[in-house]
Amino acid sequence: MKKTGGFTLIELLIVMAILGMLAALVGPALFGNLSKGQRSAAQTQISNFESALDTYRLDVGQYPKTLNGLVENDSGRDSWDGPYIRGDLPKDPWGNDYFYQPNDKDFVLMSYGKDGKPGGQEDDEDIGR
């Protein structure tokens, strides 16, 4: 009887075990970088919103009541010179709306992180000002 080339079941199990151990070691590092990238993207979007909001305030004299005021003239003022953001309002990297609350002289603008709720730690930590 002629022996054909191939792997035995034991050899395949050993290779699969080694691949599993490598995945267990490398996987968390890859997902950690993904999380850092999402947080960085949220910070960049918030900076873009801040610039657009400040430009809106220079034109209109106050901050918009909602972020939608950056893409549509919801102020009713002729001095509105938008849209101040191209296209639709972006969502945060986790698909949630940004939290925006204007007051007389400033505003609060935040991403609530992965869970979309105030507070939290690590991936769920709030990002913004």
Give the residues covered by each predicted segment.
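N-terminal single-pass transmembrane signal-anchor helix
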Residues: 2-30
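Short, surface-exposed interaction loops/tails
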Residues: 36-40, 47, 51-54, 76-78, ...
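Alpha-helix exit/C-cap motif
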Residues: 51-68
